[in-house]
Regions:
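Short hydrophobic beta-strand element within catalytic cores of glycosyltransferases
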Residues: 310, 334-337
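Nucleotide-activated donor-binding/catalytic signature segment of Leloir-type glycosyltransferases, i.e.
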Residues: 278-299
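A short, active-site helix/loop in glycosyltransferases that binds the activated sugar's phosphate group
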Residues: 163-206, 216
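Conserved acidic donor-binding segment of nucleotide-sugar-dependent glycosyltransferases
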Residues: 349, 353-362, 369-375
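Glycosyltransferase donor-sugar binding loop
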Residues: 240, 265-279
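N-terminal subdomain of nucleotide-sugar transferases
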Residues: 1-55, 121, 257-260
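Conserved donor-binding/catalytic core segment of Leloir-type glycosyltransferases
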Residues: 7, 187, 228-247, 253-256
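A charged, aromatic-enriched C-terminal amphipathic alpha-helix characteristic of glycosyltransferases
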Residues: 373-424
Length: 449
């Protein structure tokens, strides 16, 4: 059998990299291409005024070509979850590329019609969920007041206080449930996400927990970490969540404020695309040495984590996975965290010290003081799934879908060829400002609200 051809679908893809799910999609695709010899293509979205609406353009960074669909502004509510024009464009792409497998990640803005496009093209479809988009119009089960929804199971009748138009939200929920049921395989990043989705009525022909990978530490990380600790032995806390109630910032501020000691540092990661999350947040009155640091990339994260001894993760909602938690554990960084859904499904230390979601600042303060005073300040690294292992797991999961197809066609007919006017896209800013402003406000709100 020839190496399979995989078409990956995600709202973002390199060079428009944004969010943890995009990193997962890109890294798994890269490892499938480099480690397993798969041919991998991607389809994603862009929003540019200099291109016609729904124009298809191709750009490539690394081993994976990315076919970009230009989404125009002013799309309807329904087009955000089911867009016939996007579906038709992807159908043409499927007939032209003739992949052996369609792997769909985050489909907000692209729409669930990609599942139907795969089915009609005779291509097996795997859908990998990363958040609660299939259950929640607001994507993260965050209420308008910035608090976690808490429904378990999720029932559309319980969404009346959150959505603007309950009838259209009900239509959306029914449409997405029917669409997802047509997938050959649905994967979830945690047992928590799978169980909540099942209980809430989402089903598929098959489902599985497919745990996300992370970028593992480099071979010199332990030396870099030891050198930093020798240079500055103060315990350093790190917080990557932004100044939002949902991520626990008010609890952190309240927990540290009454401390009378100064023998620690706190690094706050700034993930803003423009400006700063922290520019209007007063920090000078807090005890200890507080610094705001720029967000790290996959390539330079070891430099950041070498400075951190304890990750603060007081999330006030039930998340599906928690990439940051795994990045920390893989590097011997302790984690102070709440019992926040899929983020706790790991083998890290201190699992008996999880803080209940909704507990006050005093509970977090006790854990901070325990971290400062404990004799065993530094933990050993914990085995964590990397992207190579995650790609290997996908190979195993998808084998029953791909193997019956045999050799995929190498000669494409003129009838199915892509349009001749689909020239390579001109250079694109990797910041992807227009696209993020148009498509990803919900994730930014989760960190700032």
């Amino acid at each position: 059998m020839s190496a399979p051809h995989l078409l990956v679908g995600n709202i973002f893809f390199a060079p428009y990299t944004y969010g943890g799910a995009t990193i997962v999609a890109e890294e798994v695709a890269r490892h499938l291409a480099l480690d397993h010899g798969w041919q991998v293509s991607a389809v994603s979205a862009v929003s540019r005024a200099d291109l016609p609406a729904y124009a298809l353009r191709k750009v490539q960074t690394g081993p994976v070509p990315n076919y970009l669909i230009n989404l125009p502004p002013g799309r309807s509510y329904a087009a955000h979850y089911s867009n016939p024009q996007v579906t038709e464009t992807v159908s043409r792409l499927l007939h032209s590329l003739a992949p052996d497998l369609l792997h769909l990640h985050c489909l907000q803005e692209l729409g669930s019609g990609l599942i139907r496009a795969g089915r009609e093209a005779g291509v097996p479809v795997v859908v990998s969920t990363h958040d609660f988009w299939w259950l929640c119009e607001r994507q993260f089960m965050i209420r308008p007041d910035g608090r976690y929804c808490g429904q378990s199971p999720v029932r559309i009748e319980g969404c009346r206080g959150c959505v603007v138009d309950h009838d259209r939200a009900r239509t959306r929920a029914r449409h997405l449930a029917r669409a997802l049921a047509e997938a050959d395989l649905v994967t979830y990043p945690s047992a928590f996400a799978r169980d909540l989705s099942r209980a809430s009525g989402l089903g598929a022909r098959a489902d599985a927990v497919w745990q996300n990978g992370v970028t593992l530490p480099g071979p010199d990380f332990a030396d870099r970490q030891a050198a930093r600790r020798a240079r500055d032995p103060r315990l350093t806390f790190g917080f990557c969540g932004g100044p939002s109630q949902l991520k626990g910032w008010p609890l952190i501020r309240e927990a540290f404020a009454p401390l009378t000691r100064q023998d620690f540092r706190v690094w706050l990661v700034d993930g803003a695309l423009e400006g700063s999350w922290w520019q209007d947040v007063p920090l000078k009155s807090l005890p200890g040495d507080w610094q705001v640091r720029p967000r790290y990339s996959q390539g330079d994260m070891d430099a950041f984590w070498a400075e951190i001894d304890v990750l603060l993760f007081p999330s006030q909602w039930k998340e599906t996975f928690g990439l940051t938690v795994r990045e920390a554990l893989a590097r011997g960084v302790r984690v102070i965290q709440t019992d926040s859904g899929g983020t706790v499904e790991h083998a890290g230390p201190d699992r008996d010290r999880l803080i209940p979601v909704g507990a006050g600042a005093e509970a977090l303060r006790r854990e901070i003081l325990h971290a400062l005073d404990r004799a065993d300040r530094h933990a050993e690294p914990v085995p964590v799934t990397g992207f190579a292992a995650q790609a290997e797991a996908l190979v195993r999961l998808s084998a029953p879908l791909i193997e019956p197809r045999g050799v995929w066609p190498e000669d494409l007919s003129q009838e199915n060829a892509l349009p001749r006017d689909m020239a390579p896209l001109a250079p694109i800013s990797p910041r992807a400002r227009e696209l993020v402003e148009e498509i990803a406000p919900a994730r930014q709100r989760a960190h700032r609200a």
